[in-house]
Swiss-Prot record:
Main location per the UniProt record: host cell
Provenance organism: Rice stripe virus (isolate T) (RSV)
Keyword Phosphoprotein (UniProt): no
Keywords carried by this UniProt record: Host cytoplasm, Host-virus interaction, RNA-binding, Transport, Viral movement protein
Reported function: Transports viral genome to neighboring plant cells directly through plasmosdesmata, without any budding. The movement protein allows efficient cell to cell propagation, by bypassing the host cell wall barrier.
GO cellular component, one term: host cell cytoplasm
Family to which this protein belongs: Belongs to the tenuiviruses pc4 protein family.
One Gene Ontology molecular-function label: RNA binding
Subunit comment: Interacts with the rice proteins DJA6 and HSP17.9A.
UniProt-annotated location(s): Host cytoplasm
Name this protein carries in UniProt: Movement protein
Gene Ontology BP terms: transport of virus in host, cell to cell
Highest taxon, organism lineage: Viruses
Length: 286
């Protein structure tokens, strides 16, 4: 009997259940997302906010406590509104009363971290937002430090970065930020209120900053609508900024798979390469 069972086993064939068309689409989509994730610029994938802070040299700094390392960093918040097809341009606020200690005690500074949190946004807006930061302290445009981030409109958006060059107090008006929204579905105000969160390193001496040390992390659009609730603002840095920046690392949004347009960090300071991804690179050949 044992021999007959063995012979029947040897003659048997393994049956394969072909994936349905819907199941195959899910598998293909999962593979495309995994490949796109591995090819994200600069960080080659996701890292935690603690890892990002370490890579940026911000280990003592925490979004949850503005008093941490307060003698080296200061934090300010600005708010403004953005209209469709118009560029909202503003300068960083560096007035002494904004910070723990007068900025005149630290005449040199550089932007270390920045996060943008959209509080009020038209829910059905479907445009593209471009965020641009440029240091116009230099006469030669090729020497200017410029960063540009582009993403589809979402409830919230956060960016963590580090600009290499220091700025003097006299140059405070040369650091310009512009936000523009390209959206044909909205005629007027798209974002009714935005909070701009700065973390800036201060020093008594003009420390030499190498441009090729600049690191920029692109953060995904956030889908958590609860972050816009007024109750979240009882403790801004803990409940809003930290949640926005930390949650962005775990987001699963892949806008580059849905359109031919280029999203993410599309312009870096010079000497910082950006990995260009073609449509074929993010598609998996089965």
């Amino acid at each position: 009997m044992a021999l007959s069972r063995l012979l029947s086993t040897l003659k048997s064939k393994v049956l394969y259940d072909d994936l349905s068309e819907e199941s195959q689409k899910r598998v293909d989509n999962k593979n495309r997302k995994s490949l796109a994730l591995s090819k994200r610029p600069l960080n080659q994938g996701r890292v935690t906010i603690d890892q990002a802070a370490t890579m940026l040299g911000l280990e003592p700094f925490s979004f949850s406590d503005v008093k941490v390392n307060k003698y080296d960093m200061f934090i300010a918040k600005q708010d403004y509104s953005v209209k469709a097809h118009r560029k909202a341009t503003f300068n960083i606020l560096v007035d002494p009363y904004w910070f723990h200690q007068p900025l005149t005690h630290y005449p040199f500074f550089r932007v270390e971290t920045f996060a943008m949190v959209w509080i009020g946004i038209k829910g059905r807006a479907s445009g593209i937002t471009t965020l641009r930061i440029i240091d116009k302290s230099y006469v030669n445009p090729s020497d200017q430090v410029e960063v540009e981030v582009r993403y589809p409109i979402s409830k919230n958006f956060a960016v963590l970065g580090s600009l290499a060059n220091f700025l003097a107090l006299e140059d405070k008006h040369n650091l310009q930020v512009s936000v523009s929204v390209d959206d044909s579905s909205v005629q007027n105000c798209v974002i009714s209120r935005t909070l701009w969160f700065w973390g800036i390193e201060r020093t008594d001496l003009p420390v030499s900053m190498k441009t090729n040390d600049t690191v920029m992390f692109e953060f995904e659009p956030l889908e958590d609508k609860a972050i816009n609730h007024l109750s979240s603002f009882s403790n801004f840095t803990t409940n809003v900024v930290q949640k926005a920046v930390g949650g962005a690392f775990t987001s699963k949004s892949f806008p580059e798979l849905d359109t031919e347009k280029e999203f993410g960090v599309v312009k870096q300071p010079k000497k910082i390469p950006i990995t260009k991804k073609s449509k074929s690179e993010v598609s998996v050949i089965m």
